[in-house]
Swiss-Prot record:
UniProtKB keywords: Cell membrane, Lipid biosynthesis, Lipid metabolism, Membrane, Phospholipid biosynthesis, Phospholipid metabolism, Transferase, Transmembrane, Transmembrane helix
Protein name, as recorded: Glycerol-3-phosphate acyltransferase
Gene name, Swiss-Prot/TrEMBL: plsY
UniProt-annotated location(s): Cell membrane
Spans traversing the lipid bilayer: 3-23, 65-85, 111-131, 153-173
Subunit structure of this chain's protein: Probably interacts with PlsX.
UniProt enzyme class: transferase
The UniProt record lists the keyword Lipid biosynthesis: yes
NCBIfam families in alphabetical order: glycerol-3-phosphate 1-O-acyltransferase PlsY
Family affiliation: Belongs to the PlsY family.
PANTHER family (UniProt xref): GLYCEROL-3-PHOSPHATE ACYLTRANSFERASE-RELATED, INNER MEMBRANE PROTEIN YGIH
Molecular function terms from GO: acyl-phosphate glycerol-3-phosphate acyltransferase activity
Cellular component aspect of the GO annotation: plasma membrane
Single GO BP term: phospholipid biosynthetic process
């Protein structure tokens, strides 16, 4: 029963969509109707710029941190892992927004940095490096998620942590499936390209 409660609580924390809330109350727009249609920090950056995206990113990261800490407090590491997956699912598919959310990258950053700060930092650094070199946020996001999973193979923790890392990477990749198509076709937007608000 504790596992179910932790999962539900973490999911509901994830459902607090900061991109939607911030843009709705500061600009009176639904961010999902602009740019990529994604309710996340990257799309806020694309549509409204870095000043608007920064608080959204920070709050999304904090969602992951809070959920994992709550899960760990109640059940230990198994609870942290369950909460980590659940909070990302809540961000991606929020019940309050008809399951149209973000891609879970910023929240995943908070999750992995709380579960394993060292491996999380390495994965984050590699992901940021890819973004800096290619200017593709989507490619850097997927690279970071995959890197975290691979690091847990080469520097093994428990089977549970490895399974968690793989599932998290798959969630990130799944949410970027349209980006993958655009990357292949050469039509993916690069960081710095602004979308117009009609």
């Amino acid at each position: 029963m504790k596992f179910v409660l932790v999962a539900v609580l973490a999911y509901l924390i994830g459902c607090i969509n900061n991109a939607y809330i911030f843009t709705k109350y500061t600009r009176n727009i639904d961010i999902r109707n602009y740019g990529s249609g994604n309710a996340g920090a990257t799309n806020v950056l694309r549509v409204l710029g870095p000043k608007a995206a920064a608080p959204v990113f920070v709050l999304d990261v904090l969602k992951g941190v809070v959920a994992v800490l709550l899960g760990k407090y109640f059940i230990g590491m198994p609870g942290a892992l369950i909460a980590g997956i659940a909070v990302v699912c809540g961000h991606n598919w929020p019940i309050f927004l008809k399951f149209r959310g973000g891609k879970g990258v910023a929240t995943s950053v908070g999750v992995v940095m709380t579960i394993n700060p060292l491996l999380g930092l390495i994965a984050l650094a590699i992901g940021v490096a890819v973004i800096a070199i290619t200017r593709y946020v989507s490619l850097g996001s997927m690279t970071g998620a995959i890197t975290f999973a691979l690091l847990n193979i080469f520097f093994p923790n428990s089977v549970q942590v490895l399974t968690f890392a793989i599932v998290l990477a798959l969630l990130v990749i799944f949410q970027h499936r349209s980006n993958i198509k655009r990357l292949i076709n050469g039509t993916e937007s690069k960081i710095g390209q602004r979308a117009q608000i009609k």
